[in-house]
Amino acid sequence: MEHNASDAVGTRDAGWQTDMCHRTSGTAEQGGSKNKGRGGRREQSHIRAYSSASADGYRMHRNHTGGAESPGAEQGTPPRRNSVLKRRSLIQTIMSPEGGAASPERGRRSVSLYSPASAGSDEGDVGAMLQTLATRELALLEQRKTVEDLRRALRLEERVLVAQARELEELKQRVARALDAGSPRAVLEPGAELPGAPGARESVWAKSMSFLNEFDQILQEGLEKRLGFDELMPSPATDATTPEADDRRGIWGLVSEFKAGLLGLSDSTPPPDAPAAYLEKQRNRSVGPEPRRTNTGDAVAEHSRDARYARKRDLHEQAYSPADAAAENGVVTGGRLGATPHSSGSIRKRCPPLSTSVEMQNYV
């Protein structure tokens, strides 16, 4: 009976302790209503763990005492008060010293690190961190790949640019060579020489021009000798009568005659039966500044033309009689000298017959 009574009392005390735990958990839930979520669930699990621990401790105490009643029971006092005090002392560890509910921070610190809830939360945090790390590593790899692609494209562009610059330089050289070949009068720079050339070579045009100048000079000298200019103006070069000079005169005689015929200078040669006075007068009138030597025969032709006109005028004057004053003061009418009171006839009647003269033929 005693054991049955004690078991009944223990069962009743366990029920009361369970009610107290539920009340305490309700109070804790009301006090921590603001902290919802994972913190509130941890507090509830903490309170339940301690309530189950207190119930297990009471059962262990009953088994250790062998089901004996407390001293208060032997004295006739109800054992309920003593058991209530013991259970209250076990529950005070959950409550705050002031009698209020335990704070969320203390509950979190008292929870074991090896509890299933904390382990699950830690595993979730680590998984999220690993996922974030993997995402960032993938983004970093993509950025590195993009940078490598850009560098490769830059190298390709640089190679293309170098090739285009080389082609442009070659095109410029081709254009320069084409222009040089198209313009034969292009003069090279003094310092510019073709690679592989043995030395400075004269141009074909320069040789041709020098040859023509020399030939023209020789012809001019021959003409001057034929016209007698070197006799009027002696010089050391013309005074020296050497066999070479004679040979040159003989060689270039035909050439000078041919050129004189082309220029129309054959008319200026006096007839073989010309008097000495005519030649002397011609020499006196031809004395003057030496014609300028040029590469062409224009100056020589002009000088010879003036000399021919002067000789024609001399021949015309020579045809008059010095004693006839009327002929000098006559008036030209119709291309002839008219008769004057002191004249004894026409000029044509007193002129010597010069029909065989070339000068007279040109004059008429």
Curated annotation (Swiss-Prot):
Principal location listed in the UniProt entry: cytoplasm
Keyword field: Coiled coil, Cytoplasm
Localization per Swiss-Prot or TrEMBL: Cytoplasm
GO cellular component, one term: cytoplasm
Coiled-coil annotated residue ranges, if any: 139-181
Stretches with biased composition (Polar residues): 24-33
InterPro entries: Tda11
Biased composition (Basic and acidic residues): 290-305
Disulfide bonding pattern of the chain: none
Any one Pfam family match given in the protein's UniProt record, by short name: TDA11
Annotated spans, Disordered: 1-81, 94-121, 263-305, 324-352
Family of this protein: Belongs to the TDA11 family.
Protein name: Topoisomerase I damage affected protein 11
